Every structure is written in C-alpha cells, then in structure tokens.
UniProtKB/Swiss-Prot annotation:
InterPro entries: UbiD (IPR002830), UbiD-like_C (IPR049381), UbiD-like_N (IPR049383), UbiD_bacteria (IPR023677), UbiD_Rift_dom (IPR048304). Keywords: Cell membrane, Decarboxylase, Flavoprotein, FMN, Lyase, Manganese, Membrane, Metal-binding, Ubiquinone biosynthesis. It is found in: Cell membrane. The lineage of its organism: Bacteria, Pseudomonadati, Pseudomonadota, Gammaproteobacteria, Enterobacterales. It comes from Klebsiella pneumoniae subsp. pneumoniae (strain ATCC 700721 / MGH 78578). The active site is at 287 (proton donor). Catalyzes the decarboxylation of 3-octaprenyl-4-hydroxy benzoate to 2-octaprenylphenol, an intermediate step in ubiquinone biosynthesis. This is 3-octaprenyl-4-hydroxybenzoate carboxy-lyase. Pathway: Cofactor biosynthesis; ubiquinone biosynthesis.
Amino acid sequence: MKYHDLRDFLTLLEQQGELKRITLPVDPHLEITEIADRTLRAGGPALLFENPKGYTMPVLCNLFGTPRRVALGMGQEDVSSLREVGKLLAFLKEPEPPKGFRDLFDKLPQFKQVLNMPTKRLRGAPCQQKIIQGDDVDLNKIPIMTCWPEDAAPLITWGLTVTRGPHKERQNLGIYRQQLIGKNKLIMRWLSHRGGALDFQEWCAARPGERFPVSVALGADPATILGAVTPVPDTLSEYAFAGLLRGTKTEVVKCVSNDLEVPASAEIVLEGYIEAGEMAPEGPYGDHTGYYNEVDSFPVFTVTHITQREDAIYHSTYTGRPPDEPAVLGVALNEVFVPILQKQFPEIVDFYLPPEGCSYRLAVVTMKKQYAGHAKRVMMGVWSFLRQFMYTKFVIVCDDDVNARDWNDVIWAITTRMDPARDTVLVENTPIDYLDFASPVSGLGSKMGLDATNKWPGETQREWGRPIKKDPAVTARIDAIWDELAIFKQQ
C-alpha cells in the first residue's frame, strides 16, 4: 500500500475503521490530549477533531497510535513485516556485492528499490495553494495544542524541521518540539548533537551574522514522517528512505522564501529563519518520561511565511508517561532495529525495547552465546553501533532460551543466572538524554549492563544448573487426553 499524501492514508484508515471523526467541539487546550490519551491506551483509532474550539482548521491526533498503523504508514500490512524494512536498511548501511548471478538475481528487488531514492522536484505543489506572509502571519490561527496543565504554552510536536548546513548538499529532516511565544515566533528545541543544531552551528561558523534558513513541514505523507524517525544510515537522506518505503520518488518543492525543499503534499509549511544569539527559555513541558522537564534556553525560530493546502489539517500529538505515541512508534520500529543489529552481530536472536522503558532507556537482548565474555561484547555493541541507543541506560543480555518480550522469562534469567557483583557492568560519564533528570549532570551519566546469560568456564568455577525440561513423550500423552480430563470444564 502506497500513499501519495496524508489524505490518501486517512482515506485508507477510515475504510478500515482506523479513523474516527470527532464533530463535537473540543478544546485544543488540554481536552484533545485527554481524549487522545484515553483512546490510545484502549488501542483505539486515529482521531480527526473537525471542530476544535476557536478554530476552523481540524486537528489530527493518534495517527500512529497502534503498531499496525505504523506498519501501514510504512507500506506494510503488519508489524512483523517491518523486519523487511530493517533488512533493507541493513543492506543499505553495509551493502554487499553479489557473490554470483543467482545472488545478483536475489538482490534485484533491493537494487530496484534504490531507484526510488532521488527526489522529484515540482514547480508547484499542494502545500503552496495558500501563501501567508508579512503581518498576516499568525501562528495563533493554527490549533496548536496545550497538552498538560503545567505546560508553558501551546506546543508544536509533529513538525518536520528541514535544514541544510553551509557545506552540505543533503538536507536534514528532524522532529523537534517548538514552543509558541508569539504570532510569528517559536522556540526550536533541538539538542546540540542533533542534525538541525549541527547545521546551525556550522552555518554560524561559516556565515557569521547571516540568518539561518529553516522550514517546518506539518502533515506530510506517512512515509516521509516515518522516514524522519527511522534509523536511516548517515549516507541516506530521509527523503530517499521515504521513496524506498513508498515505492515512488518523494515529491518536493522549493520553499517560497528560501532554497530548502519541503514535502510537496504537506498540509502546512512554516518558513523563516533563526538568528545567532536570539534565544529564549523553553519549557517546562510534560514529556515522554511522564515528568515535566526543566527550563532551558534554545534558539528562536521567526516565521516569515506560512504556506498551506486548501482546507489544511493540523497534525499533532501529545507525549506523556508511556504508552503514548512515541512509545508506540518505538514498539513498531523495534522490528526495524533487529535486522540492522543482526547484520553486525549475527549472534543476536531478538532485541526488545519495552515501551514502559520510555522507548529506548532499557533494552533486552537475547543471543546465542558462544564464549566467555560474549554477553559483554554484545552490551558494548548495542551502546555503540547505532546512535539511537547512545542514551540507553540499561542493557539486559539473556540466552536464546529466554523470551526477550516476556518479563516473567527475563526476571527469571536475571534472578537465577546473575551474580550482582560479577555480572553487572557499570560505565560512567557517558552521554545521557538531556531530559533524564536522574543523571547527576545534564546530558552526562552512567549506564548499566546486566549479563543474565548462563556462565561459561572462565566466568564461574561452580557447576552450573541445568534448566528443568519436561519429558516430550509424557507431554504428548497428556496432550492426547487433556480435553477428556475436563479439569477446567464448568460442572
């Protein structure tokens, strides 16, 4: 399934009962969050609020509120199919030349997909059907949500921020929250290591005193949105990956006021600039951790133009204690990560990021252990191989007889196969999420690895326990008479 734009995707969701239109007036201030949160926790549909109080523009929430909708957005039927997306990314990250004609034939589908990587630049586009500029720019006319009672101000959450460094041909797409502070002013909360912030730093060094162009796309097609949150290789642009997912080249258009290229079918595009030195205190905001984060200073984004489609839809979300939409995305993208990790570490059987671990702060790995110390090698690999896991605080490694997605299994392995002193690895002074207030220093903290594998010679001097296993023949005999026993049948 391929979608030309967000509206194509909404049509399909509605046909499948995965979209609910809300006609009752609902306030973007707190009320939409309350409804969206209850709906997501119940595994409910995406929500289109057609009459937000005080606004004429509808609000779309919970678009990716179930793993299946994430899979649908990536052009797959179910979550398990996302492993194929991961295999494609693993191939693109470290391509292997064909070993012969048969191997070449087997790889043809992957090579064919690569043809969809270049973007297609349009002269005119739906996202520029209406152009607002100058004094007419007023962000207060967009139904930007206030999600939690102590939030500082309305907050844009699903904006795809487009930037380009002074020496780069390729653009960067990143999702950074943006606090509304004026009719044409937003605070761009990007951390210093993120792509947009790096582009800005390079711009300030190369062109001191010049304004840094920025554009933000809201309501792009699902492949482009998900391309911005997927672990694409550094050599691959998010637009290129979206083309791979969609099966057609990503259509882009040059912005009205700068040379950046934005998704042609986006519902709304904000164009403007950031000036070096113009900063403002951002926050506090309720975040995906379930807490309000501290106030900090970030650059101010001045919006000079708003372009949009006729009857534009504002795409938004909320973040809070899991489950929320980022947690659901984490569950789905988990399947993408597995083949990428397995390409580098074939001994990995499964990899799981429990949603209650705030999407990435805790990982469980199961592996086919082959030698003493092997589990520690895998721990270090998880922390270092993909930048998405540089903030993972806890890595639990188990043998392949443990189900990584079953806490009963994992806790059993931890409590029976671990000695706390011997099998715990502590690493100090490592990068930690800025939002992690538990770390002693902002952005810098420790990590813990738990080796819950069976211990090999060299790791222990004791005779190691053998897991109890049932007799298969007895199990088969009891299976045959189980219904006849009627143990659970009502009298």
